[in-house]
Amino acid sequence: MNIRERYQEIEKSFLHPKSCLSSQTKGRLKPEPEDDIRTPFQRDRDRIIHSKAFRRLKHKTQVFFSPQGDHYRTRLTHVFEVSQISRTIARALRLNEDLTEAIALGHDLGHTPFGHAGEAILRELHPGGFEHYEQSLRVVDILEKNGKGLNLTFEVRDGILKHSKGRGKILSDEPFTLEGQIVRVGDVIAYINHDIDDAIRAGIIKKNDIPQQFLKFFGDRHSKRIDKMVRDVIFTTIKEDYEKISMSPEMEEMVHSFRDFLFEKVYYNERIIEEFKKAKRMLESLYNYYLDNPHIIDAQELEEKELHRKICDFIAGMTDRYALYTFEKIFIPKSWAVP
């Protein structure tokens, strides 16, 4: 019995009966030999961490575009916070922590530069539309490793595809595994808490602007809010016998209301909307430039449908700073150097 097999025996004896055991994975798109040390979900996590798309997240917007301060969240710090919250829930529930971590780290790989501004403009311009969660799956299935993809397990791919979506339902049994459902909830817990912190730091709102009903219910500090939400998820799920990852009705209602407050006061704030519009115009200019000059991205031989797809993939993969650099290089006149 090798190291992986011993660990999988530990999973069988320790994890909850409704957990997803690594030995019972539905497998990969392309079958491959098992590793003698790592389980399939551990390998998926490692492949995600070592991918180029994962490294690019450090220069992609969470809410505030290319912030000058050092303490604002980026898309990379966001996925780490989602991972931490989700792993805490998974461990407390005796669910598969490795699977949970892999989904959490991979769930935003398809996010565009400039956050949801990039997603919105690509949705308008690309004939097939655009959703970042679908793009995340496309990244791991096709785009990474020069078109070979990461060949992740079904369970991780399912969790990536079905994580939380904007103002959609927080709780859902859409993800095939309970671990995927954890990440869906963990994503919301992470962003509604860190985005409110960043909004206060940026002067978009003041702490006193947060309604007293939220401060009284969740607590007045970042750590208190997260702790209360996480505990509610854990104990409600246990109480409901793991039917699905759950929140108490009161908590779910308050989280929805708190998220609505964020949309109204932060995401739809005039200052953010103005920057949102600028980012959309910039990315639209780049998109149309590549349509007119497909040779720049080696796409001159492609039919129109494939050309749109390649441009969409190219722009979605950009970081904020690379998009700014490219726009400046193409559209901003340079001063003439005197010999």
Curated annotation (Swiss-Prot):
It holds the Pfam family HD. SUPFAM superfamilies: HD-domain/PDEase-like (SSF109604). Keywords: Hydrolase. CDD domains: HDc. GO terms for molecular function: dGTPase activity. It comes from the Bacteria. Belongs to the dGTPase family. Type 2 subfamily. This is Deoxyguanosinetriphosphate triphosphohydrolase-like protein. It comes from Thermodesulfovibrio yellowstonii (strain ATCC 51303 / DSM 11347 / YP87). The lineage of its organism: Bacteria, Pseudomonadati, Nitrospirota, Thermodesulfovibrionia, Thermodesulfovibrionales.
